[in-house]
C-alpha cells in the first residue's frame, strides 16, 4: 500500500499543475509504462519552468530555476512539505549514463542546498538531521526525469539512524538493521566531499561491484552528525522495487512532534 501511495503522489501533483485529470496522470504498472505520462514532469520543468523563465523571468510553475546550477526546484502540491530537485537537462533517472560524467552537476548536493525550502514551511524549526533526500529507481517511480525528493525523514528511520556511528562507515557497509524491511548499504561522506563531488559515480561503482544495475538502485542521503552525511543505497531487482522515498514522511510528523515538545517546555 505504501509503495502505491508513493507511485501516485508525483503524478497527482503533475496533474494538478497541467490541468490533466488524475486518471490521465496516474502511472501504468512499472513494467508497462506510458511514455506520455512518464514524460509529464520533464515537460513541466523544460517547457514551462525553464522556457518560461527565459522568456518572462518568472519561475512558475516551479519554485526556482537556477540556470547556473542547471536545476529547478518544484513544489509537490500533493504533499504539504515535499520539494523535488530536477535537472534542466534531460536526465531520465538514477540509471542515466549522464550522471557518470565527470562534468555532471552535483545534483545531490544541490538538493541538500535547497533544504531551507522544506524547513521554511515548518516555521524554520526543522533540524538538519530531520531533512532527508531520496531517489527512487526506475521501477518504483512514475516519471522519467531525475527528481530528488527533499522532505522530512520518517520518525522510524530517524530513530534507526541515530544509532549509527558514522566513523564505522568509511567504506561501504550494510546497516545493522533493515529500513522498511530492506537492506541498505551505507557510506559516510563529509560535508566537503559532499559539496565538491558528485556521488553518483561512487554509487555506480558499488552497485556494479555487487553484480547489480543502476536501474534498480534506490538512493538516500541523511545528515547524521555535524558535517557528516550517510549515503544510503538499496539494490533491488526487476521484480522487487525498493523506493527510498519510503524512508521519508511528507507530513513531517517529526517536526510536529518537536514543536509539541517545545510548546510543553515553554509552558513549564
From Swiss-Prot:
Transmembrane segment boundaries:
5-23
Task: List the catalysed reactions.
Answer: a CDP-1,2-diacyl-sn-glycerol + H2O = a 1,2-diacyl-sn-glycero-3-phosphate + CMP + 2 H(+)
Question: Which top-rank group of organisms is this from?
Answer: Bacteria
Location of the protein in the cell: Cell membrane
Q: Which GO terms describe its molecular function?
A: CDP-diacylglycerol diphosphatase activity
Predominant location: membrane
Alphabetically list the UniProt keywords: Cell membrane, Hydrolase, Lipid biosynthesis, Lipid metabolism, Membrane, Phospholipid biosynthesis, Phospholipid metabolism, Transmembrane, Transmembrane helix
Q: Return the GO cellular component terms, semicolon-separated.
A: plasma membrane
Enzyme class, broadest EC rank: hydrolase
Topological category with respect to the lipid bilayer: Single-pass membrane protein
SUPFAM superfamilies annotated for this entry?
Answer: HIT-like
Q: What EC number(s) does the entry state? A: 3.6.1.26
Biological processes annotated in GO: CDP-diacylglycerol catabolic process; phospholipid biosynthetic process
Associated pathway: Phospholipid metabolism; CDP-diacylglycerol degradation; phosphatidate from CDP-diacylglycerol: step 1/1
Membership in a protein family: Belongs to the Cdh family.
Which NCBIfam families does the UniProt record give? Answer: PRK05471.1-1 (NF003982)
> Can you say what this protein is called?
Probable CDP-diacylglycerol pyrophosphatase
Organism the protein comes from: Mycobacterium leprae (strain TN)
Amino acid at each position: 500500500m505504501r509503495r502505491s501511495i508513493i507511485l501516485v503522489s508525483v503524478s497527482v501533483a503533475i496533474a494538478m499543475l497541467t490541468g490533466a485529470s488524475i486518471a490521465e496522470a496516474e502511472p501504468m504498472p512499472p513494467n508497462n509504462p506510458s511514455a506520455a505520462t512518464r514524460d509529464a514532469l520533464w515537460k513541466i520543468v523544460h517547457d514551462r519552468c525553464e522556457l518560461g523563465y527565459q522568456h518572462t523571468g518568472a519561475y512558475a510553475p516551479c519554485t526556482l530555476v537556477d540556470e547556473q546550477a542547471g536545476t529547478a526546484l518544484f513544489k509537490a502540491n500533493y504533499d504539504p512539505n515535499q520539494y523535488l530537485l530536477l535537472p534542466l537537462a534531460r536526465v531520465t533517472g538514477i540509471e542515466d549514463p549522464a550522471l557518470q560524467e565527470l562534468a555532471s552537476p552535483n545534483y545531490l548536493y544541490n538538493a541538500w542546498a535547497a533544504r531551507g525550502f522544506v524547513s521554511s514551511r515548518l516555521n524554520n524549526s526543522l533540524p538538519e538531521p530531520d531533512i532527508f533526500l531520496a531517489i527512487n529507481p526506475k521501477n518504483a517511480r512514475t516519471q522519467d526525469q531525475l527528481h530528488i525528493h527533499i522532505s522530512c525523514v520518517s520518525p522510524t528511520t530517524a530513530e534507526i539512524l541515530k544509532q549509527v556511528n558514522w566513523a564505522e562507515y568509511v567504506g561501504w557497509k550494510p546497516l545493522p538493521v533493515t529500513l522498511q524491511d530492506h537492506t541498505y548499504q551505507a557510506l559516510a561522506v563529509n560535508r566537503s566531499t559532499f559539496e565538491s563531488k558528485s556521488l553518483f559515480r561512487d554509487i555506480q561503482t558499488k552497485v556494479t561491484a555487487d553484480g547489480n544495475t543502476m536501474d534498480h538502485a534506490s538512493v538516500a542521503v541523511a545528515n547524521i552528525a555535524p558535517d557528516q552525511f550517510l549515503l544510503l543505497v538499496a539494490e533491488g531487482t526487476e521484480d522487487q522495487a525498493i523506493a527510498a522515498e519510503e524512508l521519508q514522511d511528507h507530513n513531517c510528523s517529526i517536526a510536529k512532534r518537536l514543536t509539541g515538545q517545545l510548546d510543553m517546555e515553554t509552558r513549564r
